[in-house]
């Protein structure tokens, strides 16, 4: 083998090693959506109130809890009580796979997430399409408690920039007490602010045609959630919230968040 061919082989082997063992930022990053990818508020003819209640002040929140049961291999059940409305005392959170459920099964965790009641099943005896009394369901929303909080009860501010028709119209901060926080928690807090300040969701519809919330991690990876319901006259809360089942977490100190909205007359 001549020298030039040997060098070429070495370069090729080195390149293969990089591909196999170096995290591929671009492959893991979700590109920004095109307009055609986003749901349109005008195409939804049901009540937007059913979306609004998912991001109001009645989310599930608990600290230092352990799972007490499960229904399926990829979910966990917790004894968590609704202290505001007294609607439930048990919460089932469903995860993407059995591996995630096993990861948190015997851990002391914090739970924070948007919940639903219709099509919430704790056993095979629950009636399809009915509300199960004293119980509620969610997806993801789990973080380990030990070592995941700031000293002295300090809170981390997370900046959120809002763009309406591509123009930065408002910026605000939400707070979390967690170092590693679920994207779901930050999403809930961001949308809650926008409901109160910008009427993001109204009873029948929304002043906005499209919307998505984008998370930018410290390594450059990005991902987003569509903020509008799918077309049609019915909104399936369980199906919509399923986007949180991967229990995606971000570093609260470094994550950047953008909300992109377009108005109906924009």
Curated annotation (Swiss-Prot):
Compartmental location: Secreted
PROSITE patterns, per the entry: STAPH_STREP_TOXIN_1, STAPH_STREP_TOXIN_2
An annotated GO cellular component: extracellular region
Highest taxon above the source species: Bacteria
Keywords: Disulfide bond, Enterotoxin, Secreted, Signal, Superantigen, Toxin, Virulence
Disulfide bridge partners, by residue number: 120-137
This protein's record includes keyword Lyase: no
Signal peptide: 1-27
GO molecular function per UniProt: toxin activity
Keyword Signal tagged: yes
Quaternary context: Interacts with host MHC class II molecules composed of alpha/HLA-DRA and beta/HLA-DRB1 chains.
Function, as annotated: Staphylococcal enterotoxin that activates the host immune system by binding as unprocessed molecules to major histocompatibility (MHC) complex class II and T-cell receptor (TCR) molecules. In turn, this ternary complex activates a large number of T-lymphocytes initiating a systemic release of pro-inflammatory cytokines. Inhibits SEC1-mediated T-cell activation in the absence of MHC class II by competing with SEC1 for binding to the host TCR. Also causes the intoxication staphylococcal food poisoning syndrome.
Recorded family membership: Belongs to the staphylococcal/streptococcal toxin family.
The name this protein goes by in its record: Enterotoxin type C-1
Organism: Staphylococcus aureus
Taxonomic placement: Bacteria, Bacillati, Bacillota, Bacilli, Bacillales
């Amino acid at each position: 083998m001549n020298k030039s061919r040997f060098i070429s082989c070495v370069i090729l082997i080195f390149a293969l090693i990089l591909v196999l063992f170096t995290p591929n930022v671009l492959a893991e990053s979700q590109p920004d959506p095109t307009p055609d990818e986003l749901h349109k508020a005008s195409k939804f003819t049901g009540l937007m109130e059913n979306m609004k209640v998912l991001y109001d002040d009645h989310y599930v929140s608990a600290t230092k809890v352990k799972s007490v049961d499960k229904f399926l291999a990829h979910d966990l059940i917790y004894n968590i009580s609704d202290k505001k409305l007294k609607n439930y005392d048990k919460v089932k959170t469903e995860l993407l796979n059995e591996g995630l459920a096993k990861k948190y099964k015997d851990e002391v965790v914090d739970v924070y997430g948007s919940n639903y009641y219709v099509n919430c099943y704790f056993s095979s005896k629950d009636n399809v399409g009915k509300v199960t009394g004293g119980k509620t369901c969610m997806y993801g929303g789990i973080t380990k408690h030990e070592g995941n909080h700031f000293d002295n009860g300090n809170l981390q501010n997370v900046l959120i920039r809002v763009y309406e028709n591509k123009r930065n119209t408002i910026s605000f901060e939400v707070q979390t007490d967690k170092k590693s926080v679920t994207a779901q928690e930050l999403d809930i807090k961001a949308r809650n602010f926008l409901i109160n300040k910008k009427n993001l969701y109204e009873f029948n519809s929304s002043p906005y045609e499209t919307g998505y919330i984008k998370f930018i991690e410290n390594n450059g990876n990005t991902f987003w959630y569509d903020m509008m319901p799918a077309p049609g006259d019915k909104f399936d809360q369980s199906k919509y919230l399923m986007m949180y089942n991967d229990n995606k977490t971000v570093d609260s100190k470094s994550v950047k968040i953008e909300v992109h909205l377009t108005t109906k007359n924009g």
